[in-house]
Amino acid sequence: MRKNVKKVIAPLLAAAMALSCTVCVSAAEDETIKLTVWGAEEDQNLLKELTDKFQEKYADQKFDIQIGVESESTAKDTILTDVEAGADVYAFADDQLPDLVKAGALLKLDDYAEALQLADTTLDDVKAANVEGAIDAATIDGSLYAFPRAADNGYFLYYDSSVISEEAAASWDSLLEAADKAGKKVGMTLASGWYNASFFYGAGFTTGLNDDGTTTMDWNGTSADGYTGVDVVKGMLDITSNPAFMAVADGDISNQLASGNLAACVSGTWDAMTAQEAFGDGYAATKLPTFTVGDAQVQQGSVAGYKY
């Protein structure tokens, strides 16, 4: 799997760094081009390997490349504190793109098509190598602003099958009951619209994106499925008030898994290795559970997202 990831990221990183060199610096061969690259903690070794290869390819140019740790989930917040001081190349999740574009923190790639040839690629190559949704999510007003890197930015349920049966994992009610009997918790991040939206999506509510990048929501009304936003919130409160539920800070699921506190959690592929280590032979994953809305069991929704 790591080898496949490397094949995907290598040309994209090379293209991004080549663009940064072209845009930020007009250096002679005896001058040093300074670049800063940010990526997730688990990608640091990979980034070091790829940046080393980049420097080998352009050995006639001197580079000073600094690699820093920055999660895709927090990249926007860090960048927007000081765009000029931010990294030249960084990874982020697709929902951050409108704000980054508005702040001038991303290049309009269409304006630098010729520069991409330094990395032996073209915009047509980038578009052809990725699914349409990933390209669309990185496009604003007809212009592409980022290189798609992954299409796995969604979430589901990890659970320890030695504690939680497949049947128990099917609903929040039975999931929490099984975890409580084992003296364990079920973790989920709720202080994030990206996660708590899953309850509303499951009940038939929607969100949309305005031309100015702001989000529209219909959660205050009645969904097409006949549920009200109040009904959904009551269902969420039933879950979160259960003693077996643990509200986990964004990005902290991995730490809670490693601590041994959890029998199950809502997360994505980025926590797969940690979940496997924590649950051992009991490691299992499945769709999100159903939850109670009024008198009905409603399938909790999820999202399909991209990373750049």
List PLM regions with ranges:
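Short helices/loops that flank or line small-molecule/ion binding pockets
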Residues: K76-G86, A103, V163, E177-K181, ...
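Glycine-centered hinge/linker elements that transmit conformational signals in sensory
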Residues: T215-A249
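Conserved N-terminal structural module of periplasmic/extracytoplasmic solute-binding proteins
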Residues: A10, V23-K102, T286, V293-D295
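Short helix-initiation/N-cap motifs at beta->coil->alpha
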Residues: G68-T78, W172-D173, F245-A258, W270
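Hinge/lid segment of periplasmic solute-binding proteins
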Residues: D94-Y155, E167
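Extracytoplasmic/periplasmic substrate-recognition and gating elements
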Residues: E277-Y308
